[in-house]
Swiss-Prot record, chains A, B, C, D:
Keywords: Amino-acid biosynthesis, Arginine biosynthesis, Cytoplasm, NADP, Oxidoreductase
Active-site residue list: 149
Gene Ontology biological-process annotations: L-arginine biosynthetic process
Database matches in CDD domains: AGPR_1_C, AGPR_1_N
Subcellular location: Cytoplasm
Gene Ontology cellular-component terms listed: cytoplasm
EC number in record: 1.2.1.38
Name of the protein described by the UniProt record: N-acetyl-gamma-glutamyl-phosphate reductase
Gene that specifies this protein: argC
Signal sequence segment: none
NCBIfam families per the UniProt record, alphabetical: argC (TIGR01850)
Amino acid sequence: MIRAGIVGATGYTGVELLRLLLAHPGAEPAVVTSRGNAGERLDAMFPNLRGHTDLAFTEPDPGLLAECDVVFFATPHGVAHAMAGELLSRGTRVIDLSADFRIRDAALWSRWYGQPHGAPELLDQAVYGLPEINRKRIPDARLIAVPGCYPTAVSLGFIPLLEAGLVDTAHLVADAKSGVSGAGRKAQVGMLLCEASENFKAYGVAGHRHLPEILQTLGDVAGQTPGLTFVPHLLPMIRGIEASLYAVLKDMDTDLQALYEQRYAAEPFVDVMPPGSHPETRSVRGTNRCRIAVHRPQGGDTAVVLSVIDNLVKGASGQAVQNMNLMFGLPETAGLDGIAVLP
Amino acid sequence: MIRAGIVGATGYTGVELLRLLLAHPGAEPAVVTSRGNAGERLDAMFPNLRGHTDLAFTEPDPGLLAECDVVFFATPHGVAHAMAGELLSRGTRVIDLSADFRIRDAALWSRWYGQPHGAPELLDQAVYGLPEINRKRIPDARLIAVPGCYPTAVSLGFIPLLEAGLVDTAHLVADAKSGVSGAGRKAQVGMLLCEASENFKAYGVAGHRHLPEILQTLGDVAGQTPGLTFVPHLLPMIRGIEASLYAVLKDMDTDLQALYEQRYAAEPFVDVMPPGSHPETRSVRGTNRCRIAVHRPQGGDTAVVLSVIDNLVKGASGQAVQNMNLMFGLPETAGLDGIAVLP
Amino acid sequence: MIRAGIVGATGYTGVELLRLLLAHPGAEPAVVTSRGNAGERLDAMFPNLRGHTDLAFTEPDPGLLAECDVVFFATPHGVAHAMAGELLSRGTRVIDLSADFRIRDAALWSRWYGQPHGAPELLDQAVYGLPEINRKRIPDARLIAVPGCYPTAVSLGFIPLLEAGLVDTAHLVADAKSGVSGAGRKAQVGMLLCEASENFKAYGVAGHRHLPEILQTLGDVAGQTPGLTFVPHLLPMIRGIEASLYAVLKDMDTDLQALYEQRYAAEPFVDVMPPGSHPETRSVRGTNRCRIAVHRPQGGDTAVVLSVIDNLVKGASGQAVQNMNLMFGLPETAGLDGIAVLP
Amino acid sequence: MIRAGIVGATGYTGVELLRLLLAHPGAEPAVVTSRGNAGERLDAMFPNLRGHTDLAFTEPDPGLLAECDVVFFATPHGVAHAMAGELLSRGTRVIDLSADFRIRDAALWSRWYGQPHGAPELLDQAVYGLPEINRKRIPDARLIAVPGCYPTAVSLGFIPLLEAGLVDTAHLVADAKSGVSGAGRKAQVGMLLCEASENFKAYGVAGHRHLPEILQTLGDVAGQTPGLTFVPHLLPMIRGIEASLYAVLKDMDTDLQALYEQRYAAEPFVDVMPPGSHPETRSVRGTNRCRIAVHRPQGGDTAVVLSVIDNLVKGASGQAVQNMNLMFGLPETAGLDGIAVLP
């Protein structure tokens, strides 16, 4: 069994990682840290874990963590910067769910995250953990940057079009909507049920931190950085991201459905839906799947791609486990084959 | 007091119309019909009306309805086609909340609504009841076609850009999201709480009936029919539409904020928010307001317009009352000055 | 126009009070204070107020407040204790929405609220503002203690049974459920949408602060303090309280329906529903009504009373305005005749 | 592998049963019937099953079903009456999730379900499938009546008190609240999101069909039929039942916490929470657990028991699988060890 450490497991990505690892056939949580809750049992904070674990939170002790095979960071920005180097130097592999190592350009990172980059010397070895484009690099990686939730949904939706060079990349549009869990388990007025339920709005239109990450990925795929308008919105629900993507086609003859089906035929977690489909977020809730449908409305020159994920699974903890599976030679789907609870 | 008839008041636009008319200072519901519920008190079906009315539903008798000053149709498609002519010939004015008279081209209507147009001879006198572009024609109108909910939110958002000729009209995008009440008070599995809550999806991507209506309005404003990709989505909540609109700017020098503020300065129900705003659907819930914000993200060449309405008020019954006020010489805001209940 | 001051208007009872007073025909908000938000416009914090007021929050200056005819406290416990005395001495009447003056026994208050009572000398003049039992004392009151939300729903439900002496008062049960807005507009993890939606639980079973308040009221009505088991629960929604009340009948011959109808015949805000009804919280949302139904299931010896209110209206701000109307000789229903928005 | 048939798998208990069986280590769905959807793939109706099964619905053919080891009925009342006999006579075991065989008294069943009992001759062999009281009888049973959702939550909560003879059984109160999925996947106006969300109400106060079932179980346990007031309520959420139970203690000296812990110490699916707990429905969502807390508020003479289950799992399909496990000698928890997805 792979011994996994989790730093910062009191948030939503943390408890989701716990859920996945506690049911994983080849790994188990061994050290789970929280500065503020050391000594408390996990299942006292998260009653869904009662009967599944006797672990308690511990102080984030690098020595203890280094005894793990892999350490996950489910922490605010900057924490992995501060701790990853020591763990890596002791031979422990690191899977970071925060944004600390997602952007290759440290200066760009600093600009968007408003603080100096704490570990630019590690950027060279960080692998962006989107298996659908980086699968070959992940097994040998020591340091994985798990993609953000919006970047996962948006990138997977655009990749086939961009790889095939079918669209005008100057004016891509990504209209994305996320459940409230994307904002984390922090006390903030805007995420109260009274504020966020029976309500809908865009936010961060001027510029969201996931924009440079998406541009980096799409640029890698397209060969040059595209022009992208990215508008996130807050959905009155807990889990799920839907991204509706718009691109003007330069080539109207390609069978988009076939293109998508072929691109993702071998991907265990990308499900291209039948023609005419409208993927629902609930169909992937609690699972590591991304469901995608591609449309060309009214036979016009605009492609519409609909992409849904669970922001806490394929958009965070599930993708982290998928990376762990690849890093440790386990079946890629190990521990990730649950069926969405519906309704 | 204006005596108002309502045909088909058992749906959501019907009960909303009742709420507005029962509190209106210059009008009152006089005849309220329902074929299936004749004899039943309104407040037995809608307990929120207890203490506010003693009316009961009656059979839809044209003679009785013709005694009203104005008759509202809150009915499925085709009913107003069948009944409006007789009422008009008897001198009763008609405000139709269905789509029966929204499209000027009867053949186009038939194609989208899948049935022959039942009253093409009345199309000439029908006025599209969007006061923000047709205010002058409404006072003398005998027959008003109340705009659809999506068309109201989308058109009000695009109008300033199109009137000013600032954007490439070949590739407009309208990504719209609606609460479930837009689907009406019909027993259908897809709108059950178990299906529609904690879930999000697009629908009707191939072609939604509101598309030709939007194209007609935007075409009137722009001077030619634009290219528009319109994708509606279903929100896990009751009321509210948010439309996020995308257009590529041909002219980057215009102050968009000033443009929108000036265009709507005299409009009592269009509120242009301060720069950088993200209008929330709840801020207009139960009210006749449309709140709009305009952005140019990252200083790029794409304008993003965010437009919110309550689909049952400005998107249906409130706009119907606004038209009634204009038709009968009442203050345009009469009975429409309520404040949104928040939270 | 009555000039009203509001201390602490940044919470949910505050914004609800603003909504009601801004639409009130005989009163208006004149001074609205907030220590933390002085200088900010009300409609910047609460966009539903845009177009309805130009007021800004000010520092809570007793001098300014004393120029008002009446000052509402929508504050945490203890604030009204500290400020009410000075206002009263200057002739300004006080309507306190907090619990500061609800309990006549200062020692009992201290025990439940965990702090010394800050103004025991004012308790003599405080009138418990439940018009349905205290209507005669309210017009001359200088200091009103607005009842809590649960106490309003529970007391109105039990009063007819207790006044008539029909039930065993040793074992009353009140199973009450409240929307999340009852917890206020405070940043706290437990009230996040992610924690409170799609979830249900009891809380405070060991003892909730509203228990002594309910016991005081029921004791006044029954002539002696009853035995009451009161269990509150948290509903996954914003507004509304439903209380299901259980009492064993000593007398099986009384017509409970008639009893309730007669008791509340003259009450403008208590609506006894027809036999067999199940009142819905949404039917009173945004309104000052309490809807009640009384049942005797299976013809047995247990009475079941179902009572619903909007916790922010009849359970707080609406009842406060009802008291104001009575204190200043206005029609009791002035500004409180809105119809619930449904759906 | 146990070959399972499912009759009527298009409802919510049906799809939940599919989810559980598709992931079950010792059983698999072999025949899945639906009269109205024969020929359609399961995953076309339920997209969460995409990638997990290639099965399609078939006509309910008794011959095909009889080839299964066990057949589950997830059907409206009366269907199992009509078909169970033939299957049993062919040696196929039957697990009925409907109410057809829950009540031992056929006349009583007819009275509550408003139709003649269709198979009274089978009642003798039907075993009420609540393992916590009937575990010994289940392995040899040929016909299992899976308990209703409310009866499961209420009975498990009351059993320890009644078995120990600690309470006055004349005036038990069960105030129960259920998510909307309890009403099934039927098109009905009352269960639309627009009707059931942001709303709460009691229903069926005069008499709910689960009442005689609860009385039968509690009577078995207590030795005589108790007096019970049972009031169900509709929660604005999808899954979960919470039952708050009230009973007057005859004996004040018993340690209720110890009583409950001992009673359920060996039960794999009943989790007695620590003293002072308030179990949340979400902590059992998607799982077969019942979580229970017992309180004696204010040290008084009334016991309050809080019991939560997922109505579709421990209240239906999960309990059905638990019975199957016991019937076929599998580990009782096989396929039922998932962790609730939280948040």
